[in-house]
């Protein structure tokens, strides 16, 4: 038996913040697990904006006790599925937890639609006609979420994780190091921002915020959902071209990342949604130099880790919101939204 590392459990810090007058489409989870409840399982969950809302899904949302978007529905459904599994007292491995939550969502969607196919969504005839050439476009109408799921084991002072999408795990150490063991997959945001930047010659007087709302950018947004659990025209998963999401489709199993992190010397470990990330500067977003992009990202994440270590999640969030508000036109920090939902579940060890 491995020796118990530390009798004192880590301190939990949690933020889950949405901009005023907007529904929070994130969710979070933090529960005890194991025979004595000595382990901690936590998750940061980000509902993905659904490109199209099928009538049966909208009718289901309208019957709920509170207004829900498809993204909020997906995030909360996944949270509740995870909680039920963890509540058994001896939950399975994190990868199994994640995949079973996705399967739960798939079963619920099949109960609504009859099948996870484009025809079953019963979209308006003109919309269906535009999409019918590619059955993979069913992804545009499926509610989806991404998440980072973590499990702290005090006996070994290690952290296991299972991950799908553009949420992330950030670990900071007392010696100044930090790591982000989760990879985001093929994100569409960079391509969307570059598309917006190309419009600057045609619309030089528009702030970048307005360029991101142009019809050309919105068209790319609509079809970017094709890359959720992406498969090629032959139905073969293409992990380097797609991004893992929990949308009920079984192809998710090819996109789940798992691993273990040694926490020796760690100050904190934090699962977070991308809205809690310090935004990338224009120099990082639009650079063509891979080494420069890597260096700027490392500097940005290092600064972020330092702010969280010093000020805590709430203090960091206050500074993040101030920086976003000071850039209302999205020129310093090119991004799709001024403020995104921001969620983090942090385990502080020192």
Stretches found by the model and what they are:
Residues 63-117, 291-327:
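Helix-loop-helix
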Residues 41-43, 163, 269-271:
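Residue-level marker for buried hydrophobic side chains located in beta-strands
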Residues 57, 216-350:
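C-terminal catalytic subdomain
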Residues 1-83, 136-144, 167, 245-262, ...:
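N-terminal entry segment of metal-dependent catalytic domains or homologous docking segments
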Residues 52-54, 159-160, 170-173, 180, ...:
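Short helix/loop capping segments that flank catalytic or ligand/cofactor-binding pockets
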Residues 34-38, 154-157, 177:
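Short, solvent-exposed loop/turn segments that connect beta-strands within catalytic domains
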Residues 90-174, 205-261, 332-339, 343-347:
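Catalytic core of PPM/PP2C metal-dependent serine/threonine phosphatase domains
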Residues 7-14, 127-134, 326-328:
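Short Pro/Gly-enriched beta-strand edge/turn motifs at strand-loop
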């Amino acid at each position: 038996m491995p020796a118990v590392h530390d009798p004192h459990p880590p301190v939990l810090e949690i933020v889950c913040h949405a901009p005023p007058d907007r529904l929070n489409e994130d969710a979070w989870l933090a529960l005890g697990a194991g025979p004595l409840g000595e382990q901690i399982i936590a998750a940061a969950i980000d509902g993905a904006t659904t490109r199209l809302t099928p009538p049966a899904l909208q009718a289901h949302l309208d019957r709920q006790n509170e207004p829900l978007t498809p993204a909020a529905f997906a995030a909360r459904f996944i949270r509740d599925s995870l909680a039920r599994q963890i509540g058994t007292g001896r939950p399975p491995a994190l990868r199994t937890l994640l995949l079973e939550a996705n399967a739960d969502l798939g079963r619920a969607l099949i109960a609504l639609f009859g099948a996870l196919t484009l025809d079953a969504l019963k979209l308006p005839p003109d919309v269906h006609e535009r999409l019918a050439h590619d059955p993979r476009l069913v992804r545009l109408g499926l509610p989806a979420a991404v998440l980072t799921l973590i499990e702290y084991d005090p006996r070994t002072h290690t952290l296991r994780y299972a991950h799908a999408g553009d949420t992330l795990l950030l670990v900071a150490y007392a010696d100044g190091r930090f790591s982000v063991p989760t990879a985001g997959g093929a994100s569409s945001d960079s391509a969307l921002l570059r598309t917006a930047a190309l419009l600057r010659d045609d619309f030089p007087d528009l702030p970048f915020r307005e360029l991101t709302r142009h019809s050309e950018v919105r068209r790319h947004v609509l079809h970017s959902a094709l890359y959720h659990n992406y498969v090629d025209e032959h139905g073969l998963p293409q992990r380097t071209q797609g991004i893992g999401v929990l949308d009920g489709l079984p192809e998710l199993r090819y996109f789940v990342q798992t691993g273990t992190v040694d926490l020796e010397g760690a100050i904190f470990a934090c699962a977070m949604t991308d809205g809690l990330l310090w935004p990338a500067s224009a120099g990082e977003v639009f650079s063509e130099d891979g080494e420069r992009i890597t260096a700027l990202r490392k500097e940005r994440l290092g600064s972020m880790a330092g702010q969280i270590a010093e000020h805590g999640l709430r203090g960091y969030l206050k500074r993040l919101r101030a920086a976003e508000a000071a850039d209302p036109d999205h020129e310093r920090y090119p991004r799709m939204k001024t403020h995104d939902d921001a969620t983090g579940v942090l385990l502080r060890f020192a």
